[in-house]
Amino acid sequence: MKRIAIIGGGISGLSAAYQLEKARATGAGIEYTIFESSPRLGGSISSERVEGCVVEAGPDSFLTEKPWAAALCKELGLGDQIIGSNDSQRKTYIVVHGKLVAMPDGLMCP
């Protein structure tokens, strides 16, 4: 029996656990434990409702041109929860001194 430690319960750690769980389902002799320092899984990814709006933190999207992400969502039973973007409303905001400030179109941060 192989014993595996997964350090961190963010998207990478959870993806590793998912792949290991699939291997276990086919008979692989694997035990794994996820070690996460915070009280919740998800790493920097989170969603909160603030005054009726969903506020996303961390990466909140993926490119559907990369079919593996959409395929994984469908495999996990989340395919019907994928929400396409509305290009006419696509805008990025940051919080500066407690206020939302729209970022200029096309601005990229390193």
Predicted segments, located by residue:
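Gly/Ser/Thr-rich beta-alpha loop segments that engage phosphate groups in nucleotides
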Residues: 10-15, 44-45, 60
